[in-house]
Amino acid sequence: MKWYEVRVSTTDEASDAVSEMLTTMGAGGVAIKDPFDIKKEILKPNSLDYADDEFLESLGEDVVIQAYFQSGNDIDKLLKQINEGLVNISQFLNIGKGLEGYNEVDDEDWSTAWKKYYKPLQLTDRIVIKPTWEDYSPNADEIVIQMDPGMAFGTGTHETTQMCSILLDKYMKDDTEVLDIGCGTGILSIIAAKLGAKQVEAIDIDEVAVKVARENIELNQEITKVSARKAVLSDLKAEEHKYDIIVANIIANVIIDLSSQIPYYLKKESLFITSGIIKERKQEVIDACEKNGMSRIETLEMGEWVAMVFKCPDTL
């Protein structure tokens, strides 16, 4: 079988959104080469990797995303859809150079191309993400999440996912009921379940994303705790069910739009954990949530990104 290797040159801030878009368009796998991550890893004080200044400079500034689609796809139509998706993302984030082109590669080349990029990743102090084929011996207190590269494993490295994971780990209790808005690959829903959530409901507006999330949920043996479906928040009946934690790793515009609805779906004294917010939009999100009766209790920042926790003192 042959594959189309589609290359997109983007920015660190837009890489997660772009890789998620390519996955939902049907990519068999997505490889992300982020010079910022490479530099960060190499420059750690305890890193065993060595690189001279010339190599570090050669990495450049662009995040290169390679997405692999089966060659049976209409490539012209696919490229048009990708360009349209990039235009949509560019309304909220700086996407950089954008679509650079494609190559046709053999099945063997494809497998060589993506496997080398996927290794076990320490997402937080005790949460590890690993590709399905990699062996990993966890420590006693570590939680291991399995992700298949065809399901955009690379997106778990993004700062917004890391911060949401840290906050879920901090605030999760054994009897917690969680709603994951804009679940994407389902990674946060699975993490919530592994951390002891009683029940997790995952929703997304994209049907392909929901399919991917369901596959990931099954892969991690959490189908009894986690359900995923195509829906928007208003499809859920607030009078029938409320949640202890709502998590939303989405863009600032959507968070602001949802801020008036969130309190209706939270139990009294419950939490709204949100990220996907660039620093420049932080205050807008704070203002919107506080206007709707929520109070900010914690803020995390990584790179250009912000995550926040809001408490809802009363249910509506």
Swiss-Prot record:
Its EC number is 2.1.1.-. It comes from the Bacteria. S-adenosyl-L-methionine binds at residues 161, 182, 204, 249. SUPFAM superfamilies: S-adenosyl-L-methionine-dependent methyltransferases (SSF53335). It catalyses: L-lysyl-[protein] + 3 S-adenosyl-L-methionine = N(6),N(6),N(6)-trimethyl-L-lysyl-[protein] + 3 S-adenosyl-L-homocysteine + 3 H(+). GO terms for biological process: methylation. This is Ribosomal protein L11 methyltransferase. The lineage of its organism: Bacteria, Bacillati, Bacillota, Clostridia, Eubacteriales.
